[in-house]
Amino acid sequence: MGITILKNEGLDFHARISTPLSEIDDDIQKELLDLTKKVKIAGFRVGKVPVSIVKKKYGTSVRNDIIERRINHSVNHVIKEHNLNIIGRPTIEELQNESDKALEFTVKMELLPKITIPDLKKISLDRPKLEVNSKDVEEQLEKLAALTKNYTKESKAKIKDGDQVTIDAIGYIKEKAFEDGKLNDFKVIIGSNALIPGFEKQLIGSKTGSEVDVNVTFPENYHAKDLAGKDARFVVQIKAVHTAEPTVIDDEFAKKFQSNSLEELRTHFTKQIENESEEAINTIMKMNLFDKLEKLLDFDVPESLLEQEKNILKSGTDKNEQDESLLKDKSSKEITAYYNKLALRRVRIGLLLAEYAKSKNLQLEPDDLRKVIMQQARNFPGQENMIFDFYKNNPRAIEGLKGPALEDKAVQYIFNHEIKLKEKKYTKEELEKYLEAEEQRITLI
């Protein structure tokens, strides 16, 4: 076997490989002889079929198999001989495969870069810490009390905020009743904003038995596209009005929600408020870490990975209205530069984290995959069981989660064992503003 290196620069390795015709012919002859002992051909006993007959029947397929094996063997030999850390499948070009000539071909391989892990202990980040106060907890208790109000007392007074109103309604657009515009015995809490914006407010001041004309405009993003943005008039019959009995927030109230006391329910809400912000904090912390890493990394990345990531980004933007709006006023040159920079960042950080996980011998556990599946499910409120069933019944989809799961594990390990974290305290209101600002920023990265 002859090997001529054509290119060994950066992350590209190209070589021309040749195998003498005599070696190919020897391999073919051995294979044909072996087949004479196995094949069944009419008119011949097994093991007594002439080579010429076997060659006539199987010669082409045998040659193709031998060529494929020789190519694979030669490529693997080059990889081992030159200690190449390749990515993807080698590309075979300029194949010379005539039956009377030596086997020759060019192999092109893309290499993974040599990655030096930076000193992560030099990185420091602020970690937001939510300080839940009594006001935050009391607001949650009030919301819970409002949701569980008992509307048993019928009222003949004028409708006011907080009343439960039972209505019949027929909707008209340009004086024509429209499909799905009818409500029967529909109960709505005034001020809950359960109906189209402005609908509930126009019922205030009316009484049981009265008829009210309600004029509204369907939101532009209304789920029924044929109604979105259109003006409508509803003829509403007020059938009943009920006021809520006052809710006393005490130990008895708490017991309705599997708590032994009001204090225990308060503790539950404190933890719930803390947990609600934890996922958003972790996402932002991860992006802040990536910001730091991006400045430390300058190695070349494989072109194939870069192109793959750019295609993923473009596909994602096409489906995401928020991302699309960020780029709508940009020139094609600016959009290309944006994708190039973001793809380079993601590929570099992904390769670094894979190398870091390898250096620390981090292994995926079932819990790691469960966490990623839970994160996916939270993106589809109300469809969680469908997401769980999808991954349960699709092993290949689970395989696709292993990369992100290992990346998350590496990031968590870095947070716990490498970088310096400084706790920064926020009130609930301050944290919400911070998270909102950060979430807008990270949509760009």
Swiss-Prot record:
Highest taxon in the source lineage: Bacteria
Protein name in UniProt: Trigger factor
Any single GO BP term: protein transport
Taxonomic path: Bacteria, Pseudomonadati, Pseudomonadota, Alphaproteobacteria, Rickettsiales
Localization: Cytoplasm
Keywords from the UniProt entry: Cell cycle, Cell division, Chaperone, Cytoplasm, Isomerase, Rotamase
Keyword Acyltransferase on entry: no
EC number: 5.2.1.8
Function: Involved in protein export. Acts as a chaperone by maintaining the newly synthesized protein in an open conformation. Functions as a peptidyl-prolyl cis-trans isomerase.
GO cellular component: cytoplasm
Transmembrane spans: none
Family label: Belongs to the FKBP-type PPIase family. Tig subfamily.
Matches recorded under NCBIfam families: tig (TIGR00115)
Domain PPIase FKBP-type stretches: 162-247
